């Protein structure tokens, strides 16, 4: 089953210092029918304005992946980490037994990123942090694993049966991706237009995949997109 959701049907939150789309129930948005997709709990598409950000706040028992699309954010947390996350960087934070952190845009330009929350395979993990950098040219014509609990080389690790990919396809490029009938996946289009098993998905749109052995991803104009592959339960 493939469910397509248009860009206009995302929940939009404008807090002056932050403009964001919540793809699932989060913060000021709640829909009992849109809380999660399998082990995927959150996918937020966020812009933080210059010299703004998130103050110190806690998390626990969640794998949190940040994909920096443009700009930069400064991350500090209770493990002692203080790092700048630049465009092209991917970060995995294991909240585990409990972590506090802050994220602020200390630059003079807006920061645009995706934040993805996935339920971990086990409870009680020690909090940890991992960061990796990816060059945009590497996404052309292939699905590149950014974060993975399956041991993909070059990806940040996750304590979850999940993988997050990014790809940039030129017009007409097509690839088959094996999902598995016992898994779920979400395809989110960052720019361009594509089809998922023939269903059109525009910029800002998404396709939610359940109980499908495989999907065919085809770009029509050039397309930049991510795939989040998770256990269904």
Model-predicted segments: where are they?
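Jelly-roll (double-stranded beta-helix
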Residues: 1-233
């Amino acid at each position: 089953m493939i469910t397509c959701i248009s860009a206009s049907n995302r929940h939009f939150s404008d807090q002056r210092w932050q403009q964001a789309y919540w793809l699932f129930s989060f913060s000021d948005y709640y829909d009992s029918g849109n809380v999660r997709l399998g082990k995927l709990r959150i996918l937020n598409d966020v812009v933080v304005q210059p010299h703004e950000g998130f103050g110190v706040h806690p998390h626990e028992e969640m794998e949190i992946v940040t994909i920096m699309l443009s700009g930069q954010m400064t991350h500090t947390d209770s493990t002692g980490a203080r790092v700048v996350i630049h465009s092209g960087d991917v970060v995995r934070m294991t909240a585990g037994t409990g972590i506090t952190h802050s994220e602020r845009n200390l630059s003079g330009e807006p920061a645009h990123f995706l934040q993805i929350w996935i339920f971990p395979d086990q409870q009680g993990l020690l909090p940890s942090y991992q960061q990796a950098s990816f060059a945009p040219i590497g996404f052309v014509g292939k699905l590149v694993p950014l974060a993975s609990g399956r041991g993909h080389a070059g990806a940040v690790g996750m304590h979850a049966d999940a993988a997050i990919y990014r790809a940039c396809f030129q017009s007409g490029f097509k690839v088959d991706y094996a999902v598995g009938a016992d898994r779920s996946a979400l395809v989110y289009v960052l720019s361009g237009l594509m089809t998922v098993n023939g269903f059109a998905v525009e910029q800002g749109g998404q396709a939610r995949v359940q109980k499908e052995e495989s999907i065919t991803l085809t770009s029509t104009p050039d397309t930049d997109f991510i795939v989040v592959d998770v256990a269904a339960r």
